[in-house]
Regions:
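Conserved beta-strand positions in the central sheet of alpha/beta enzyme cores
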Residues: 2-3, 56
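Short, small-residue-enriched loops and turns at beta-alpha junctions
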Residues: 8-13, 63
Length: 171
């Protein structure tokens, strides 16, 4: 079972992992994967301590060399902080975290976006050039500050493993 908690990029949850995992674990004994704001090996270990079996990272992997994301998206992630992440239901009718800079680059004003009343996962917006979420409007999790460079996925995985082992060794 994948739990998307508060802080996740894209369509996000509203409950923190600290509350979500124990609540689900109280009635579900199968595998749990926790996502949302996990950016390093210590966060993966924290997910396990909470009762999850795995931690899920998304935003960090978008900025890897192997990612199919446009270079401009990856560069935007490297430059971003949590202050650049905006929660809005404007594009799909479902709240999601997006990079404000991508909204601005698409010719929209983040301060004037209104939530859709309907739900549509086409992600279209009737603004300049009919921008589309996932193509023109890019998501990121609140832990985006941890994306400090574009690197090979293998390098990121090795870093996460080392951080995880360090966190696991702590009493």
């Amino acid at each position: 079972l994948v739990l998307v908690s508060a802080g996740a990029g894209g369509h996000t949850g509203f409950v923190t992992g600290f509350a979500f995992v124990p609540a689900i674990r109280s009635f579900f004994d199968g595998p749990i994967i926790l996502g949302g704001g996990i950016v390093d090996g210590a966060g993966i270990r924290a997910a396990e301590v909470l009762g999850a079996d795995f931690g899920y990272l998304g935003t960090r992997f978008i900025a890897t060399e192997e990612s199919l994301a446009p270079e401009s998206y990856r560069d935007m992630l490297v430059a971003a902080t949590e202050e650049d992440v905006m929660l809005t239901a404007h594009f799909t009718g479902v709240p999601a975290n997006y990079l404000k800079t991508s909204i601005i680059a698409a010719g929209l004003d983040p301060d004037t976006l209104k939530a859709r009343k309907d739900k549509s996962f086409e992600g279209r917006h009737d603004g300049p050039e009919n921008n589309k979420a996932w193509r023109d409007i890019w998501s990121a999790g609140q832990g985006v500050r941890a994306v400090d460079k574009i690197q090979p996925a293998a390098t990121l995985i090795a870093q996460l493993k080392a951080e995880y082992e360090t966190a696991k060794a702590k009493p």
